[in-house]
Amino acid sequence: MNCDSKGGLAQTMTNRSAFTRRKFMTISTAGFAVSMAKGSKIASQERDDPPLIIDCHAHIYGEDETRYPTIAKPYRPPNGKGTIQHLQQEMQSAGVRYVTAIQTSSYYRWDNRFTADSARANPGFMVGVCTLDPDDPRSPDQLEDYVQEYHIRGMRSIPAKSGRLDDPGVDKLWTTAERLGIVINALVDRDKRAELEGLARRHPKLRVVIDHCLNLKAGPAMEPTLSDMVALAKLPNLYAKLTFIPTGSAEPFPCRDLHDACRTIIQAFGPDRCVWGSDFPCELWCPKVTYRQHLGIFTHELGLDQGTMKAILGTTAHRLWFTRSA
């Protein structure tokens, strides 16, 4: 589906002059400065600062498996990849200022200690998103503790053992998240669209980010999934996480087979309800691209105008995860 025929945003996307390749490369090579002091607050950015870029989707892996034990058969990144040090190196190289660390369930499952401890230890550049068991009655209280005592600003939501996203256990967690003013990250495929829509309507004040846009990918299911995303965009409290291009593409970088789909989603949701994430560590989750190449798809390949890039790469995410609403 080509969004060029829909006008409006598609036309402005072709104007790249306001954010040139030279400017971006200058930012990327110069890096950035972040405060590592414990308890420091993420301040508002000055006008003269480099463009605000926030990575909304990074999985982090601890090196101390005695303190932070893994599940029985963890999905491991290559040696030396996925650590916080590696993440900081990638961020600095690309000019990324802040990051949202998503609980690495394929490594720790429900044990959120490493994500929570890392977020609390690095408040100058990181917030955490936990994942809790919807079938465990203790989970709502655990969520409140993570938010109050750690630097957790969101919860990743998955279906319960019943197979349903609108299970009572899930709903209780959403109710708690809504009261706490944090964000829900919904990790579901298109078969859960109706359940996702129902829950979102039931919690109108809860901001819900659709991880990987229902896992959109090239192939026979692309158009139906894209149609579902466009339909979900009608709900004002739903947001799109545009992380699917390198994970769902059947082509090498710059993964052009999903560019039109991405533009269509941006047009449907608007830049103020779209965010970018790297899928860090890319060596594990999207090995066809590097960290900087994934960012480069949005700064150089999609033809986005400056205002659209500013929202998708920074200001929308800052409003969601780095500004407390409760």
Regions found by a protein language model. Give the residues of each.
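Mid-domain alpha/beta scaffold segments of enzyme catalytic cores
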Residues: 39, 46-172, 176-180, 299
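A short, hydrophobic/aromatic-rich structural module that often spans a beta strand
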Residues: 102-121, 208-209, 257-264, 288-297, ...
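Active-site metal-binding loops of divalent metal-dependent hydrolases
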Residues: 58, 104, 213, 279-280
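Mid-to-C-terminal alpha-helical segments outside catalytic/metal-binding sites
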Residues: 3-4, 9, 14-39, 45-56, ...
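Active-site micro-motifs of SAM-dependent methyltransferase domains
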Residues: 60-62, 215, 247, 282, ...
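Catalytic pocket-lining loop regions of alpha/beta-barrel enzymes
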Residues: 153, 164-275, 284, 325
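Short beta-strand segments
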Residues: 100-103, 131, 241-244, 275-277, ...
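Short, structurally constrained coil/turn elements
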Residues: 47, 122, 148, 202-204, ...
